[in-house]
Amino acid sequence: MTHFLSSRVRAIRFAIEGWLYVIRTQQNAWIHTLASICVIAMGFWLQLSKQDWAILILTIAMVWIVEFINTSVEVLTDLASPQRNSLAKVTKDVSAAAVLIAAAASVIIGVLILGPPLLEKIQALISTF
């Protein structure tokens, strides 16, 4: 049992190191971090339903997962092809496109979920003046 727990702790530590690597080396990771924090804070403020929370959490996770995979693809491509190579460029471009699609989808989902209750709150605030 002790070996099982220590190996789980080690695995979690490696995962955190990977996440920190992405945050340190990828400029877009800072955008994802800020967006994640803002969406979560807004979700609490708007008192979202469990269903809306589930969708937002899955959406945030999707963007992070694709960013992690993109970073892995970039690092492996650099390792395999340190010189400029047209196929290496295609590999990186396609991987970056996946992040772009995930991020764009997350914005649309965020607007669909957060938009109506946010407008309601804003209208309520305006009507008090």
Each predicted region: which residue ranges?
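Acidic (Asp/Glu-rich) catalytic motifs at the cytosolic membrane interface
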Residues: 62-98
